[in-house]
Amino acid sequence: MPQASKAFKPDGSGNWWIDEEQFAADFAADIPPEKAWFMAISQVPISTDSFTHKVTKPAWKTKPTWYMVAAADRSINPNQERMMAKRARAKTIEVNASHVAYISHPQEAAKLIEEAATFEAASTAQVNA
């Protein structure tokens, strides 16, 4: 699967953007074009620091984790997503979706979030009992 790295462009001030013309194909291929275009023109840049900052205490090492693999993602290779989910021992689901899987598959995303929230609520109740 080709990566979308050529669509990510630096702006010279330490931020990166996804090229508006390539946004739909590389980032949001499975949603209606008008929604992808709106996302492209309203995107918030990502800081270079996001790619280089070292995380010293990742939460996934000590907390339960859930992950939705986007099997048609062109921004993060789906095999990399699967590896990250496995490493985190995450409860994992997989959808045939682009990087914006939470938009193209809202029911699946909501169900996974509800499962995580229910698990956390039950865990908290046991601790407080």
For each feature predicted by the language model, list its residue ranges.
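Flexible "cap/lid" loop of the alpha/beta hydrolase fold
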Residues: 1-20, 47-50, 76, 84, ...
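Conserved strand-to-loop "acid loop" that flanks and positions the catalytic carboxylate
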Residues: 64-73
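C-terminal and late-domain segments of enzyme folds
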Residues: 74-75, 81-90
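Alpha-helical elements of Rossmann-like donor-binding domains used by nucleotide-donor carbohydrate transfer enzymes
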Residues: 22, 38, 80-83, 108, ...
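Helix-loop "lid/cap" segments that line or gate small-molecule binding pockets
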Residues: 21-30
